[in-house]
Amino acid sequence: MSLRFVIGRAGSGKSTLCLHEVQEELKQRPRGETILYLVPEQMTFQTQQALIGSEDVRGSIRAQVFSFSRLAWKVLQEVGGASRLHIDEAGVHMLLRKIVESRKDGLSVFQKAAEQNGFFEHLGSMIAEFKRYNVTPSNVYEMWQQLDAHSSSAEQKLLANKVYDLQLLYDDFERALIGKYLDSEDYLQLLVEKLPQSEYVKGAEVYIDGFHSFSPQELEIVRQLMICGARVTITLTIDEKTLAQPVNELDLFYETTLTYEKIKQVAREEKIEIEKTIPLMEQPRFHSPALAHLEMHYEARPNEKFHGEASVTIHTAANLRAEVEGVAREIRRLVAEENYRYRDIAVLLRNGESYYDVMRTLFTDYNIPHFIDEKRPMSHHPLVECIRSALEIISGNWRYDAVFRCVKTELLYPLDVRKETMREEMDEFENYCLAYGVQGKRWTSEDPWMYRRYRSLDDTNGMITDSEREMEEKINRLRDVVRTPVIRMQKRLKRAGTVMQMCEAVYLFLEELDVPKKLEALRIRAEENGDFLFATDHEQVWEEVMSLLDTFVEMLGEEKMSLSMFTDVMSTGLEALQFANIPPSLDQVLIANIDRSRLSNVKATFVIGVNEGVIPAAPMDEGMLSDEERDVLSAAGIELAPTTRQTLLEEQFVMYQMVTRATEKLYISCPLADEEGKTLLASSFIKKIKRMFPDVKDTFITNDVNDLSRLEQISYVATPEVTLSYVMQQLQTWKRYGFEGNLDFWWDVYNFYVTSDEWKQKSSRVLSSLFYRNRAQKLSTAVSRDLYGDKIKGSVSRMELFNRCAYAHFAQHGLSLRERDIFKLDAPDIGELFHAALKRIADRLLRENRTWADLSIKECEHLSAVVIEEIAPLLQRQILLSSNRHFYLKQKLQQIIFRTSIILREHAKSSGFVPVDLEVPFGMGGTGSLPPMEFSLPNGVKMEVVGRIDRVDKAEDENGTFLRIIDYKSSSKALDLTEVYYGLALQMLTYLDVVTSNAQTWMKKGGTASPAGVLYFHIHNPIVEVKGDASEAEIEKEILKKFKMKGLVLGDADVVRLMDNKLSTGSSDIISAGLKKDGSFSARSSIASEQEFNVLQKYVHHTFENIGKDITEGVIDIAPYKKGNKAACTFCNFKSVCQFDESLEDNQFRTLKDMKDSEAMEKIREEVGGE
């Protein structure tokens, strides 16, 4: 029994010496004693390859490469102890979830923390750390007693409570494992116990290579190997000079020096012979003098400079994507020009979450075979999502999001259906569920779902059309596709008495859905597309899910568990599942994390993402215990993993390892911006390398080839997929600035695309965008007639929409596009309710031959409640009755109608105008409808403007009959003559024209009526600010002012007094007008003469004719208006359709100049030739 150290700096040949010794021994004595070659998990594959890589050794039974966990499995297979069930990380998390849920009420710190994402991952890591450092539950309990007895500050009490919680959970976890299960850390503890019994290990030659430190648990294994084996050889990366000096925590080799001393101490304790250390002083790894210099003088202060040509390259990139593309181009150059194999190249990085997706895309585009050494979670795989969402459906009462997350996995689809068709149907089905607010018991009820197109509150026709019946049948068929398998599982879960029966319910759910066959189809399709890595995912995920169910049953099978806890535990297990990474080929670029990689035999290393805070890493205090808490535990004798401070001290060694992996070339790069454009800083580490290699230039990498010389641009011509974007870049330059001399070879590249049989069609789609103009071509007369017909019938709102943006009109009325209907109460629904409520009250008053003035406050309140109760079941598929929240909203809307009724009562008392008709249709056909506003357009097309007028009021005096329009609005609005001029506000003047043109409808003896005005009535329940001693009458007066109607009224003092009979001088509280003492109107009055009203009505006719002409002639310009801070695009539903983009020359707003009313009126006169 002996111990031997092989030490040396990085690249000194430690591993090579050990491998040569083993290979020589195998040649001399192929059937001798066992040779164990122990390496970290990440090194096992490459070490096995190196061991049998010589021509003299093609295979071996005597020598085996192991990791600690693999050796444990081997020994336990030999001597026993492996019969207990192994639980993996997912099983550990599930067991911990169950323990936490059962212990929740007794936990102090972790009761709420358990609901946070990642909690069980941290808890599992903490328990694993306890085990690796030989800390038992009793040790933790003793620590708690000690802390609890001496806790005085809040921080100390928090730590004591945290340690108490950890002790409870750790103890429960260990009790659950005893005699039945083994987790990964238990294997190592069992290995320590069983090694003395192993004949396989007894007398073995042991090599331990590639480690820099050992946990206490691993150190115990090393102890037993020294006792049982013939000789143990351990390699450590240490400079021999370091061993001759006192241990200094700032030394580069501090960590490995401590490891060296610990192992020697173990050897002394066990009286193991310590052989003479073998120091290796040469640098055989490095074929480059520069890399040898970097390794030898890495820690020197001040930095030792290397002059001359160096094989170290530094790049600064404009952004992350440019950096990765630069790496890809250089890899292709090394392979093409310097005869590198892809396996000779490695890319090292730390913040993989920022890089991996970009690297997958770009390396694929550059045709670079690559393998990313990272564990990918299974949580996004359709199978995992299907199980998780299906359980959420059941435990969460069939919520919309859970249902359609499950649907979109496509595993609920029948096996024999065409997926494309099913997707389209499910999209329609989802739209129905959104529109009808389907959730909860409606899914499980046997009552068939109804389908009716929602039209209006007045539509009480119960007849169902054929198309509605057909849609109804489809919806109920799709409902059964979705709900039937889930309901079956739901019933089984409710009947289940044990966890085993609940797991069986999940398994039967998957089996009845034919999930194995569906996953096989996905695997075949992935292989056909060349995605071999992802093809294996579908096999792995089924095996892992089955293993998870088996583990669940083995651990908790006979226990009873609530559905909610079962869902939580299952979800925790599913979240922990990960894909095993199996390299699909041997010749590929390895992409690995700096902290986990153990590279060897690479010629070129690319270290990317070398930014401040990343390399070296910024301090990160994460996990269950903070650094301060770890220090407290360490002072009390509990050794745990290194603190952040210790980790930072080890960072220099990590970076030293990072830059000494390559034998020939080292590339270091950093981006100056991330994918979102956020600024990043270069690391201080790059400055250090620059000081060591002052002759090395920092090369800037950009995506814009225009900034480069012709020779540099040639390197950007790579694969056809990649180069196409740069061709586009050059052609854009040509288009903007004309031909330049350095574009000539790009024309050759362009010619390749347009003449290549393979690329001609593909490139044409991309190259056509060069001449892309986001301009809507005018429709032909034939197409316009097909879309709109020979007779146009449209509302005033439609005409206004055309003037806001012709393309929006085309999208809505030509293509009939609309947003999907959502089961929610929007402003239009509320507006519709207000109109309907006020109409019902007014209709009742007309039937009873009463006016608003006749109502009492109590009657206003009663009628408001009655009409809201009548309307609520009719509005938006009974939305106001669908939930407590909507019921509360119904009460608020009732209060608004009540307040509005009171104001209408006050208005009626003060006014000579009375409502004579409500919701007056024109051009709608049927009894009671006024005729439409008709136009014969120059191209022969007939156009009718139709609509519905909220309220028509009439007043009479000795001067004649006057009619006015009242329009109810749920938001404040005034009539802007500038908007009238631009055709954006035509509604009120159109209504006034219609009623005055058909005045005989409301005249007892026939005759004509004059226009009295148009007013907007704002329906709301305002809040007013008053002094604390204000009387009730003063408060009511202030409220009345908030309801002042804005608009345009006839400039006749008598007519204005008819609207507000309390007005003598001053401003009216009812309308936007006021009188001076001399009887003239105040400056702020919104008035127009009768002649001006006539001009406005002529202008409205003129505008409609122009709109009709443009519609029928196919005008669909993408030309939205902009006036001040108002723009057509602000609330437009079709922005994603027109893709209006101000950065394009063709896409600019029609900027409308704001004008005073007098200026606008003058322009209107000019247009119609009015006086």
Curated annotation (Swiss-Prot):
Residues 1-343 form the UvrD-like helicase ATP-binding domain. ATP binds at residues 8-15. InterPro entries: ADDB_N, DNA_helicase_suAddB, DNA_helicase_UvrD-like_C, P-loop_NTPase, PDDEXK-like_dom_sf, PDDEXK_AddAB-type. One of its GO terms (molecular function) is metal ion binding. One of its GO terms (biological process) is double-strand break repair via homologous recombination. It is an enzyme of class 3 (hydrolase). It holds the Pfam family UvrD_C. Keywords: 4Fe-4S, ATP-binding, DNA damage, DNA repair, DNA-binding, Exonuclease, Helicase, Hydrolase, Iron, Iron-sulfur, Metal-binding, Nuclease, Nucleotide-binding. Residues 281-587 form the UvrD-like helicase C-terminal domain. [4Fe-4S] cluster binds at residues 805, 1129, 1132, 1138. NCBIfam families: addB_Gpos. Belongs to the helicase family. AddB/RexB type 1 subfamily. Despite having conserved helicase domains, this subunit does not have helicase activity. This is ATP-dependent helicase/deoxyribonuclease subunit B.
